[in-house]
Curated annotation (Swiss-Prot):
This is ADP-ribosylhydrolase ARH3. The lineage of its organism: Eukaryota, Metazoa, Chordata, Craniata, Vertebrata. Gene3D superfamilies: ADP-ribosylation/Crystallin J1. It catalyses: [(1''->2')-ADP-alpha-D-ribose](n) + H2O = [(1''->2')-ADP-alpha-D-ribose](n-1) + ADP-D-ribose; 1''-O-acetyl-ADP-alpha-D-ribose + H2O = ADP-D-ribose + acetate + H(+); O-(ADP-D-ribosyl)-L-seryl-[protein] + H2O = ADP-D-ribose + L-seryl-[protein]; alpha-NAD(+) + H2O = ADP-D-ribose + nicotinamide + H(+). InterPro entries: ADP-ribosylglycohydrolase (IPR050792), Ribosyl_crysJ1 (IPR005502), Ribosyl_crysJ1_sf (IPR036705).
Amino acid sequence: MSAVGRLAAVSLAQVRGALCGALLGDCMGAEFEGSDAVELPDVLEFVRLLEKEKKAGTLFYTDDTAMTRAVIQSLIAKPDFDEVDMAKRFAEEYKKEPTRGYGAGVVQVFKKLLSPKYSDVFQPAREQFDGKGSYGNGGAMRVASIALAYPNIQDVIKFARRSAQLTHASPLGYNGAILQALAVHFALQGELKRDTFLEQLIGEMERIEGGEMSASDAGEHDRPNEVKLPFCSRLKKIKEFLASSNVPKADIVDELGHGIAALESVPTAIYSFLHCMESDPDIPDLYNNLQRTIIYSISLGGDTDTIATMAGAIAGAYYGMDQVTPSWKRSCEAIVETEESAVKLYELYCKQLKTP
């Protein structure tokens, strides 16, 4: 099937699934954020009680969803992508609700963006950390909507990079966002095989990382022996894990990470999605693949809201809205607005598909 044929097959259900999956991951993951040791039975008990809850909107979203909403609003208002508009929306969203869990570093970026002193919207991010920029996962956590708005893979890469660079100037930060956007993009294309999916991601990231030499940052900020094509290295490790059976979660965390760095979380989200395409012996089969993905990603501990929101976006894009169950959907704040946004993003996607 041609690329155009595959793109034309993307459905509203997939776009809704991606945004709702991301929201579910954020809201549910936030309940466990910051704990290095999350026990799976605790996550399953949390889910069981949640499904019995009669009151709607009992789980609240974090900065992950707040920033995702800002991205969506900007894309809808400025379909050709406008970094000035997006930066303004980031800063204003923070100013409106500063208690959603923002990190101290990005708060300084937002405050500078609110100042008339800065005419270059990328400058505040470049000034972070003595000019090295942030390598955190904040650009990746909000980037799924880029893949949901633009069918062309080069647009996905370009706009994922630019949207992330508004707050994350380190190649490790914005390349993590590109990888997450690509994962959503490829998940939208229909039935996939895990190895093929990973090979597609590795192929794109080899070109991107090789061209930008982001590995120089990996030596400073991460493991000294992982200095060449860091995201590709993690993707290859995922292939190794998937080829094995019953890999301990401790090994997943040790090798892929569960932290706030993009390198320590985006590959973990991708692994969670791919691992949960098949049954997990520790997670009851009554849960579907999307639910299993979110449960599993939370059980890895660490930055649970962000890893789960990224994994949820990928899984939702692949499985669609059918796997977003009513009891889970009802539990989340802003679910109605999220579904409304999905319709508008899908309309934008279809318009972009028709653009020569």
